[in-house]
Amino acid sequence: MRQFPRTRAAVAWATVFLATFSAGLTSAPAAQPLYVLGIAADSASNVYLADREMPGVWRMSDGKLSLLFQGSKKFRTPLNAVRCLAIDHQGKLLAGDSATRDIYRFGDDNQPVPLTKGQLGIPMSIAVNKAGDLFVADLEVHRIFKVPSAGGEPALFAQVQAPRALAFDHEDRLWVVSHGKDQLLRAGADDKFEAVVPGRPFEFPSAIVVDEQGTAFVCDTYAKAVWKVSSGKPPEKFASGAPLVSPVGMVRQGADLLVADPRAKGLIRIDAAGKASLSAWTVAE
């Protein structure tokens, strides 16, 4: 009986601790994006942002942000470590998450549906071909996987050293940003890769966009720049310096490039002339 007060105090302390811990696993709504890594844009001019720190996904429409999906702080829950976004051939949003080792498709209810049952490692980038197949750059195992449009078991497409970003061009050829000996690769008709840019001209390439003319734009995080790679020419800086601070994600919207930069505290837009501008976050009420 003498131990009862101590026991009761211990139980009370444990209750408070567990309540506090559990509360920490449920993210409070963020006032604005905290650490944006990925970006995607659909045909309706909506822009989507992967927020690694919140964690979750924001949607920007008419220049204003709203929360599309908020994940949990609990590890191995959907989008706890969201890293990349893409739009599929039907206009649906895709997201890659390393916490659950999976990629997701968002339904009409804005809820993510897993597509591979956790059979991936670290999905860094997703690209979709004209047939609707999903291609995933898996940084953990240095492979690119092909996933059926409806989901299913990933099939090995290629082994590439440290694949960071993927994109398809208008000819349905897959381009890959690699951190291997050749940093920019492209798959031919036989699915074998050739070096578009031999060697390592970039500091830390992290994203790629290819326009209708076959010109590639490569986001370079450490160089605080976006490079332009035209056919038969060496890479040239297309935009560099402020407002670019630590650019990691990039997507096309019309003739412009939209850049996700976790340290810029806003959306960066680069026009066709290479002029970059920053729009501060505006969250819809």
Regions found by a protein language model. Give the residues of each.
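A short beta-strand motif characteristic of beta-propeller blades
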Residues: 29, 66-76, 111-117, 152-158, ...
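Blade-level signature of beta-propeller repeat domains, shared across WD40, Kelch, NHL, RCC1
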Residues: 251, 256-285
